[in-house]
Every structure is written in structure tokens, then in C-alpha cells.
Amino acid sequence: MNIEKTDYINSLLDIYAELLTPYQQEIMDLYYQEDLSLKEIADEKEISRNAVFTLINRVEKILINYENKLHLLEKRKRIQDELDNEINLDKLKEKIELILDE
């Protein structure tokens, strides 16, 4: 599994997991947090490996769609960049307000 993709999906899960069903959350947690294989998840849930694969791909697309519409991860990263780079608190407050108003 690609580490960059894993980090990206984990970041999306941090933000949007509550918008998923409990079952979707559980499968994604087993795959991305617990690092179980598709087969291990399939065995544990008594479903086919293909069903796990399909569900994970579907949820990944859902998460990416949420981000494309809401941009919460992008805003979080931009705010963190401003926090890392800005010393003047008044300027920082203005920049964060601009980001959140978008």
C-alpha cells in the first residue's frame, strides 16, 4: 500500500469518519489503523475478500468526494502552515479567518 495514499486517507478519516456508517468506519479502521489485510478482514467479518476490497474503494471515493466539496483537510493544512510560519498573532488571526470564510 502506498504510504502517501495511506496518510491521505487516514487524514480524511480523522475529519470525515463520523459521516460514514459504523460498519464503514469499522472496516476502514481495520484496514488503515489496524493494518489488517483484505483477507484478514474478510475472515473476521465472514464476507468475501472482494466485498472488503469493494467497500474500501467505495469509502475512499466517498471520503475524497467529501474533501472535494468541503475542503476541511485543505483548510486544516493551510491553518497549520500559517501557525508554523506566523509570529504576529493579529496577522495570524486575520489569515485564519480568511481561510475559514472561503
Regions found by a protein language model. Give the residues of each.
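Short, Lys/Arg-enriched N-terminal segment that forms or immediately precedes the first helix
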Residues: 4-16
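Short amphipathic alpha helix immediately N-terminal
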Residues: 22-34
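Helix-turn-helix DNA-binding elements, focusing on the entry/boundary residues of the two helices
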Residues: 37-38, 45
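Hydrophobic positions on the alpha-helical face of helix-turn-helix-like DNA-binding modules
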Residues: 41-42, 52
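Helix-turn-helix DNA-binding motif, specifically the short coil turn and the N-cap/start of the second
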Residues: 48-49
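Residues within the DNA-recognition helix of helix-turn-helix
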Residues: 55-58
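C-terminal flanking helix
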Residues: 60-67
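Intrinsically disordered, low-complexity basic tails/linkers immediately adjacent to helix-turn-helix/homeobox/MYB/SANT
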Residues: 71-92
